Design a protein with these regions (language model features):
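Short, compositionally biased "basic patch" segments
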Residues: 98-117, 132
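Acidic/polar active-site rim loop that often engages polyanionic ligands
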Residues: 85-88
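Gly-rich Lys/Arg/Thr-decorated short loops/hinges at beta-loop-alpha junctions or inter-strand turns
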Residues: 113-122, 147-149
Length: 308
């Protein structure tokens, strides 16, 4: 990717790159890449004062007869050749102009050394992610209180954000069905009568490091679904620049739904968190299901077909 950006700059394209020098384990290589990019003529900026930039965002802007046209890539994982072979991540490439316009505003704010104050499509921390997640949880609470089916599905690495945890407890008490895949630290205990009996939490630790983040709100006919760079940790939701993008294409939405549902059925590497705080083996399927191996086989076959 660095080589491609260098080539673009050398071919006369305007290239702006934000490099977070505080990226753990990658500080030295990021400094070297920054020098290489600057030497090629790229404009390089180094994060945001007071906030770590953890979003993974690429925006291509083209001038056409009709004006500016955007192509946006938003991911859950870093542009890192080493971790990309070890981590599971998701990436969205879209020509949806409403997403591109807000991505452009994110970059504009970063160039000014500011955080974005308001969004309509993207969820962008530190000011426009946690509050919007809480609003979507509240929507499900309202549906449940009206005796309508309500659902929340979350896949993240860690859950420590007290405000979101308390809202999820409130949702469970209202009758919202909540399913969560939380790989690492989890400060919410499911299955406690009167509090979290409607919450199921599993952790998947397997061949690859689970790293993708998925947010699902609502039943199929009104579902909102996002992929994100942010875990539900206070450091992510209010102390970092993070981006979550809505998945608007029906085919991709169905694919994400299927992936999430498959992970919730994983009884090979998936362990269920119980009400006493321990993780236990589970048996869901007639034959053991390893979601990572299943997705790997699917990806391998699709790569052979050269299809997505």
């Amino acid at each position: 990717i660095v080589d491609a950006l260098v080539e673009a700059a050398e071919n006369g394209k305007e290239v702006v790159v934000l490099v977070e020098l505080r990226a753990r384990f990658d500080e030295e290589s990021n400094i070297e890449y920054s020098r290489k990019l600057e030497e090629a003529g790229c404009r390089v900026i180094y994060g945001l004062n007071g906030f770590k930039v953890h979003s993974k965002l690429c925006l291509i802007t083209r001038k056409t007869d009709k004006g500016l046209e955007y192509i946006t890539q938003i991911g859950t994982g870093n542009y890192n050749e080493k971790t990309s072979t070890l981590y599971t991540d998701l990436s969205l490439i879209t020509a949806k102009q409403e997403i591109g316009k807000e991505a452009a505003e994110v970059f504009a704010c970063l160039l000014r050394g500011e955080t974005i104050e308001e969004t309509h499509v993207l969820l962008v921390a530190p000011k426009c992610l946690q509050n919007k997640v809480l609003d979507m949880i509240d929507d499900e609470i309202c549906h449940a209180k009206n005796r309508e089916e309500a659902y929340i599905g979350i896949k993240i690495n860690s859950l420590t954000d007290k405000v979101i945890i308390e809202k999820l407890v409130e949702a469970s008490q209202a009758g919202v069905k909540i399913e969560m895949v939380v790989r690492g630290i989890c400060c919410l205990i499911p299955g406690i009568p009167g509090y979290t009996e409607n919450i199921k939490i599993i952790s998947i630790v397997g061949r690859f490091l689970e790293h993708s983040r998925i947010y699902r709100f609502g039943t199929p006919e009104r579902e909102k679904i996002y992929i994100a760079s942010a875990d539900f940790m206070t450091r992510n939701t209010i102390r970092r620049v993070e981006v979550a993008a809505p998945v608007l294409d029906d085919t991709l939405r169905a694919r994400l739904d299927e992936m999430f549902d498959t992970m919730m059925k994983d009884d090979e590497k998936g362990k269920e968190l119980t009400s006493n705080g321990t993780y236990v083996d589970r048996r869901v399927n007639a034959e053991k299901l390893d979601s990572q191996e299943l997705f790997y086989e699917m990806a391998y076959k699709n790569a052979e077909k050269k299809t997505i």
